[in-house]
Regions:
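PLP-dependent enzyme catalytic core of the Aspartate aminotransferase-like
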Residues: 20, 100-155
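Active-site C-terminal subdomain of aminotransferase-like
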Residues: 1-68, 72-106
Length: 155
């Protein structure tokens, strides 16, 4: 049973939920579209993209496409380096907050399935997109990908 203060926090948060979700989803769509054309990204996984294999189904079931975006980059080394080079994106294993989070699932949330047939790809980066400026988030992720690509090529 939640206490009175916890209940008050939930009630207060509900007042801004719609605007936060709108921004969360819009930012994810902008980021997914941007990185779909990025030379260091092999594939973007986001159901809001028309190129996603589940786009039609998602569009028939959802008003919006959420704030989770996954990137398959060129190598495991690049993915590990990139998640450690962001300044705005926080390296964390959570989702659903207002802040943007980045993780390397193969070493973090899905490490226990590393040898399974359904294991997370080692070159996968997972993003939980927050409500910060989409331009700032893109710029931060851009610099991390460029620096990580340079490091993986030279190292």
């Amino acid at each position: 049973v939640p206490g009175p203060f916890d209940a008050w926090l939930v009630l207060r948060g509900l007042k801004t939920l719609a605007i936060r979700m709108e921004r969360h989803c819009r930012n994810a769509a902008v980021i997914a579209a941007h990185f779909e054309r990025h030379p260091n990204v092999a594939q973007v996984l986001y159901p809001g993209l028309p190129t996603h294999p589940g786009h039609k189904l998602a569009a028939s079931q959802m008003r919006d496409f959420g704030g989770m975006v996954s990137l398959l980059v060129r190598s495991e080394e690049q993915s590990i380096a990139a998640v450690g080079r962001t300044k705005i994106w926080k390296l964390a294993e959570s989702l659903g907050g207002v802040e943007s989070l980045i993780e390397h699932p193969a070493r973090m949330t899905h490490a226990s399935t590393a040898d399974a047939p359904f294991a997370a790809p080692k070159n996968l980066i997972r993003l939980s997109v927050g409500i910060e400026s989409a331009d700032d988030l893109i710029e931060d992720l851009e610099q991390a990908l460029v620096r990580s690509h340079s490091a993986s090529v030279s190292g």
